[in-house]
Amino acid sequence: MARSIKKGPFVDGHLMKKVETEGPNSKKIIKTWSRRSTITPEFIGVSLAVHNGKKFIPVFVTENMVGHKLGEFSPTRTFHGHAADKKSKVKK
């Protein structure tokens, strides 16, 4: 179920303050654990480091990302490939 339009997008207050003080063209990377925050137009041009549970993944916000959540750009799980077929290994 989508979020109600009358509520508006959710952005953590502490993250919004940091983005406003740093400005869009700042070289400084802002670290955040707030994966649930929605990217708004104020975030365009800002470099963020989004935590994935283990480390911080660098994310540079562009216009195409507006409306998405920060967590979408820092995957929490790594895919190492499917297990090989044991039968084919034994026959060789």
Curated annotation (Swiss-Prot):
Cited PROSITE patterns: RIBOSOMAL_S19
GO cellular component, one term: cytoplasm
InterPro entries reported in the protein's UniProt record: Ribosomal_uS19 (IPR002222), Ribosomal_uS19_bac-type (IPR005732), Ribosomal_uS19_CS (IPR020934), Ribosomal_uS19_SF (IPR023575)
Lineage top rank: taxon: Bacteria
GO molecular function: rRNA binding; structural constituent of ribosome
One Gene Ontology term from the biological process aspect of the record: translation
TM helices/strands, residue ranges: none
Similarity comment: family membership: Belongs to the universal ribosomal protein uS19 family.
Role noted for this protein: Protein S19 forms a complex with S13 that binds strongly to the 16S ribosomal RNA.
This protein's name: Small ribosomal subunit protein uS19
Species lineage: Bacteria, Pseudomonadati, Thermodesulfobacteriota, Desulfuromonadia, Geobacterales
Gene this chain is encoded by: rpsS
